[in-house]
Amino acid sequence: MTTAKHWTRGTKLNLERALKIGDELGGHIVAGHADGIATIVKRDDLPDMARFELRTTRELARFIAAKGSVTLDGVSLTVNTVQDVVFSVLIIPHTLNVTTLGGWRAGAEVNLEVDLMARYAARLAEMK
């Protein structure tokens, strides 16, 4: 399930060129495959950043860890805190200005891609 069903002509999306062999890997690996949806529970606008709390499914929450990585609406981010199925991210002003994240409000649904390495680690643990 993704938010694509709500897109219309003119909907702004976050797009990044694919990594080429030999390029520097400056973040975490993003496959571009949405695993599901997270719902914005709360937005706090702080002096030097915005803090978002998001809720996801229990199935996807098991792959999310504090200081780990998630991709939300195509933007690679570091998880700040996790409590059960709710997690938070901190967004700096530059990211708010150059992505669609600046327009996020409580109640909105966003695409969620969990960390690929966390997904693989969980699968390996299941197979033991």
Write out the residue ranges for each language-model feature.
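Conserved loop->alpha-helix
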Residues: 1-128
